[in-house]
Amino acid sequence: MRSIRKRWTICTISLLLIFYKTKEMARTEEHQETQLIGDGELSLSRSLVNSSDKIIRKAGSSIFQHSVEGGKINSSLVLEIRKNILRFLDAERDVSVVKSSFKPGDVIHYVLDRRRTLNISQDLHSLLPEVSPMKNRRFKTCAVVGNSGILLDSECGKEIDSHNFVIRCNLAPVVEFAADVGTKSDFITMNPSVVQRAFGGFRNESDREKFVHRLSMLNDSVLWIPAFMVKGGEKHVEWVNALILKNKLKVRTAYPSLRLIHAVRGYWLTNKVPIKRPSTGLLMYTLATRFCDEIHLYGFWPFPKDLNGKAVKYHYYDDLKYRYFSNASPHRMPLEFKTLNVLHNRGALKLTTGKCIKQ
C-alpha cells in the first residue's frame, strides 16, 4: 500500500512539472511571436489589444509620429522584401487564376472552408483572364488606398491620382469624395458581400443600374473578386458575372488563386507578425511589392480616434461600425498597421495618415 501511494505521489509531481513547463513554453512562444525581425525591431506590446486610447495617447511620442511624411524610399530594402515574398508567392501568377486553370463544371473546395465546394459556372469561366492581368507589369510608384475615415479632409486626392498605378479596396465610391481620395482606379477589389451592403443585393432594377454604372466608370481596370474564399457569396458572384457579361462592361475581371491567402499569411507569420487572416489592405500591399518600386499607403487607420482624439469613421463613405480589437474579428488590423508603420520608418513604403502636402 505504501509503495502504491509513493507511485501516485511521484506521478502527481511529474504531471505538475509537465503542466508548469508547458505553460512556461507557451508563454515563451507568445513572447517570441510578438517580435518583428530585422532592423527597427518592434515589440508588439499587450497594450495593442487592450485599448486603442492607450495606443493613441502613446502615439504622439512613439509609433505614429513619422506617419504623415516619410523620408526616402530605401530601394535595397524594397528589393529585399520583394525577394523574400517571392519565396512564398508570385503576385504576377497568384493574383488570379486563368482560363486554363479550370473548365466549366469543375468542382473546387473553398479556400477557407474545405468541406464546402463550388462549381465553376460557364459565366465564371468565360470571365477568367487568358493570362494574368499583372503579367509583365511594372510601375515606378503605386498607391494602395484603404477605406478608413482618416481620409476625410485629407486633401490627398490629387496626390493619390498622381501615382502610376492605384489600387483601391471593396469598390469604394470615389466621385463624391474625389478631393480626399482621388478617382483613378487601376485595380480594385470587391468582396462578394459588397453586393448586399452597397447595392441592396440587386433586389430591384435601380440597384442593378447603380452597380453597372459604378463598374462602367472602371473602364479597363482590373476588378479583383475573391470568389473562392468562403461559401455564402457564390450567388452574388454569379449575379456580378452575369451583369458584366450582359452589359458588355470593359472591366477586366480577376479571381485570386486558391493558394494566395495562405501564402500571404505564411510570409507574415514567418516574419513573426502573428496575423489571423490578412486584411484586404495588407493583402494588396503584399501583392504590390511584386510590381511597384515605391508603394504609398493611404486610408490605413484601424482606430476609432485620430491623434487629436477626434472620432474617425471605419469607412470614409458609410457609417458601418467595426470592433478593431475584438477577438472575433478575422483580422488583426491594429497589429497590421503597427507592422506597416515599422516598414514606413525603415523606408520600405510610405504611409500617410494625415493631410497631404500640396505640391
Curated annotation (Swiss-Prot):
InterPro entries: Glyco_trans_29, Glycosyltr_29_Sialyltrsf, GT29-like_sf, Sialyl_trans
GO cellular component, one term: Golgi membrane
Stretches assigned to the Lumenal side: 21-359
Xref: CDD domains: GT29_ST8SIA4
Chief localisation class: Golgi
Any matching Pfam family: Glyco_transf_29
Gene3D superfamilies, alphabetized: Glycosyl transferase family 29 (3.90.1480.20)
EC number: 2.4.99.-
Topology versus the membrane: Single-pass type II membrane protein
Function: Catalyzes the transfer of a sialic acid from a CMP-linked sialic acid donor onto a terminal alpha-2,3-, alpha-2,6-, or alpha-2,8-linked sialic acid of an N-linked glycan protein acceptor through alpha-2,8-linkages. Therefore, participates in polysialic acid synthesis on various sialylated N-acetyllactosaminyl oligosaccharides, including NCAM1 N-glycans, FETUB N-glycans and AHSG. It is noteworthy that alpha-2,3-linked sialic acid is apparently a better acceptor than alpha-2,6-linked sialic acid.
Protein name in the entry: CMP-N-acetylneuraminate-poly-alpha-2,8-sialyltransferase
Species per Swiss-Prot/TrEMBL record: Bos taurus
